[in-house]
């Protein structure tokens, strides 16, 4: 099983932006030295706690400070930029990283981001679906492209201004052939979007703040999509993220990983719980669909979403989870704020 790293990141309000960016870089450099396979970094335009505004730009600073770890957007929010821009930026990044690039994609879930760029009232999932079709077409086709899909707002063609003898009118293709690995973060239990991911050979990453009870539903839907495409799903393509704290003794693990008022794990899930409630998405923390919102307390979330303890205890928790989920290809460690860098 591979080990991966994912961070949104989430830092307390008021922390120095430059300092948190340095810490987030250092965490990935350490993950590279420890042999982690990949590192996913999220992005938001309008959240001071989640400090990375462009994950591709952030990762570009790490290319020459890391050796083997794959640098993954986690995610590039496809509703926030024209797909032609995303396609060529991703292609360039893939060349800069010499193939150490994974393209994580999503529609972008933060409403304030959408409001800032004037798309709050639009269907971001539809924009996402249209954008990825165009990105893939740009990578697959040659000039003049003439991309004009039905019911798709994005039309891409370079007919009037091309000058092939000058190199004008062509867009870059990725370093990896036929394209980089594409990964989608999955949050909702029983998400139908995972079926579509299977059909298109995109790979799922199950979110660390989803109850383990629901993880199996992601694999079932992914396998269904692969079968509908005439292919067999491979467990190596499924990533499962979890929130984990390991200490030398259970007392320290309980304090830092759960009980202490200053615990970065507690802060993280206070943030996530409040944001999910505000967005009417508390269902991600529910053990069953009919569970009342009142039962989704902070302690309930911590009890179900954080593995903490000594090495052996945490290993037992991971193995118990795997009994429910079945095999998966990568365990993705969720990064927290650095309350105590030691």
Residue map of PLM features:
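Acidic (Asp/Glu)-rich catalytic clusters
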Residues: 32, 59-67, 90, 94-101, ...
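Short, acidic/polar
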Residues: 18-30, 188-195, 314-321
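Hydrophobic faces of well-ordered beta-strands that scaffold small-molecule active sites
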Residues: 3-5, 39-41, 71-74, 101-105, ...
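Active-site mouth loops of central-metabolism enzymes
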Residues: 7-22, 76-84, 178-189, 303-311
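Conserved, mostly hydrophobic/aromatic
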Residues: 3, 35, 43, 62, ...
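N-terminal beta1-alpha1-beta2 module of alpha/beta enzyme domains
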Residues: 1-73, 179-180
């Amino acid at each position: 099983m591979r080990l991966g790293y994912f961070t949104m990141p989430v830092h307390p309000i008021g922390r120095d932006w430059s300092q948190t960016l340095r810490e987030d870089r250092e965490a990935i450099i350490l993950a590279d030295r420890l042999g982690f396979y990949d590192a996913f970094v999220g992005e938001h335009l309008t959240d001071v706690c989640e400090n990375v505004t462009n994950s591709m730009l952030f990762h570009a600073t790490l290319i020459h400070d890391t050796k083997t770890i794959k640098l993954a957007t986690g995610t590039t929010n496809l509703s926030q930029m024209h797909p032609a821009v995303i396609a060529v930026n991703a292609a360039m990044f893939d060349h800069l990283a010499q193939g150490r690039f994974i393209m994580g994609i999503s529609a972008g879930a933060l409403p304030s981001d959408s409001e800032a760029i004037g798309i709050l009232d639009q269907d971001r999932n539809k924009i996402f679906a249209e954008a990825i079709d165009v990105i893939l077409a740009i990578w697959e086709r040659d000039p003049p492209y003439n991309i004009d899909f039905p019911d798709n707002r994005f039309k891409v063609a370079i007919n009037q201004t091309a000058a092939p003898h000058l190199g004008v009118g062509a867009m870059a293709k990725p370093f990896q052939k036929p394209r980089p690995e594409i990964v989608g973060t999955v949050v909702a239990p029983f998400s139908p979007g995972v079926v579509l991911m299977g059909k298109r050979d995109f790979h799922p990453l199950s979110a660390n703040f989803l109850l383990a009870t629901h993880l199996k539903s992601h694999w079932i839907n992914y396998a269904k999509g692969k079968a509908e495409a005439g292919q067999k799903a491979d467990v190596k393509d499924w990533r499962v993220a979890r929130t984990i704290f390991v200490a030398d003794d259970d007392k320290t693990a309980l304090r830092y990983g759960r009980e202490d008022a200053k615990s970065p794990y507690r802060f993280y899930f206070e943030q996530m719980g409040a944001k999910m409630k505000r967005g009417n998405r508390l269902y991600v923390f529910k053990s069953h669909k009919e569970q009342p919102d009142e039962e989704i307390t902070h302690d309930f979330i911590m009890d179900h979403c954080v593995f903490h303890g000594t090495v052996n205890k945490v290993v037992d928790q991971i193995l118990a989870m795997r009994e429910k989920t079945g095999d998966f290809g990568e365990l993705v460690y969720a990064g927290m704020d650095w309350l105590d860098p030691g």
